[in-house]
């Protein structure tokens, strides 16, 4: 089979860990890829809550959370890189309806597919006051792959890939996200062999 000359781009896709994944960080994980190019990939694990919730996080950064319904939401372990740094995955918030390319926040990556990832504190300040995006996932740390690293892991069948569905991120209970992501491929976890790709 001839190699495809176009570089692989899995931006706005889920990486779903195969059952045999031995790395504890990524075992049974679903990673939302925010960026993927020939230089590497960056994503956030969306189904590994940390031991703190948003109420605790906001207290740590000295912000009063005026939206109590957000307080119990978990802060996620986005990955093993920069685990003290916050990353907020959210639905788009625009300065003007007629200028959707302009984000409200100081440091926001617009992800093709309709989501945004913000790393500046202003998004948390907006959430604290009751403004800001309605649908959010807050994580500490992120997941990163160097040039060719993700492609190599895909070739080893470490991951399944599927186009991302924001409903899995924002509207699905944490403990169901792995299975829901697999269902996007028409698969069920119990049918997958832990030895896939290692015959």
Swiss-Prot record:
Family in the record: Belongs to the UPF0301 (AlgH) family.
Organism: Variovorax paradoxus (strain S110)
GO CC annotation terms, alphabetical: cytosol
Superkingdom to which the source organism belongs: Bacteria
The protein, known as: UPF0301 protein Vapar_4617
Disulfide bonding pattern of the chain: none
Listed InterPro entries: AlgH-like
Matches recorded under SUPFAM superfamilies: VC0467-like
